[in-house]
Each structure stands twice: as structure tokens, then as C-alpha cells.
Amino acid sequence: MKKGMTLNEYQEKAMQTCMPSCDNISYMLLNLVGEVGELASKIAKDIRKGNAFIENNELCFARQVGCGEILERIEEYKKEAGDILWQLFGFYTAMGWKANDVAVGNLDKLADRASRGKIDGDGDNR
């Protein structure tokens, strides 16, 4: 991906790798959930094995894990995050949405909430 690429440009390029099943909204949504689960599972397994822990909202690695291994794990997490991004944008495409429109709409919603002091709370329409 080139520097300065827009969300829509990424979406267009990434979706060139789609198979016909990418048009299926249910399939894309369920795979998105699956990809998020894969990332969570990798981190959970590192925690279970004592190789990682979360402290003060940061993912930390145990002393016995060498620097090279830490870098490998971080790269694996990043690859999974990339799969999540691809799947999310695939879902957008199946829905007929442009990624930039989704992002701008979300920022507008957040700015409106902030202007009314409603960032914290429950529900989309607060």
C-alpha cells in the first residue's frame, strides 16, 4: 500500500482479490467476526502460555520471550489486523458502502456527541 492512500483506494485495490462469495453479506460479516477472533485467540494463547500479559491497558511480553520472538509475534498480530481490515472493507463493499463515507459519517457522529457532551453513555442515538 502506498503512503497517502485513501480508504477508498485501499478498498478498491483490496477488493480486486475477492472471490464471488464476497458479494454475500452474511459470509463477509461472519468472516469479519472470525478474523477478529483469530487475533484475539493469538493474544489469548500468548497470555495463557505466560508469554504475554496486559498491564495498564498495554500488551506486554514476559522476560523469557526474546526480542526477535516479540517482533515476530507483533508482526503476526499486525497480519491478523490486516485480515480484519480486508474483511471489514469487504463487508462495506457487499453492503454497497464506500469506506471514506463510513469514516466521515462516524467522525460526524462523534463530533456531534462531543459537542453535546455525550461521548460517554449507551446506545448509538445518545
Placement of each model-derived feature along the sequence:
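Flexible "arm" and connector segments at domain edges
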Residues: 1-126
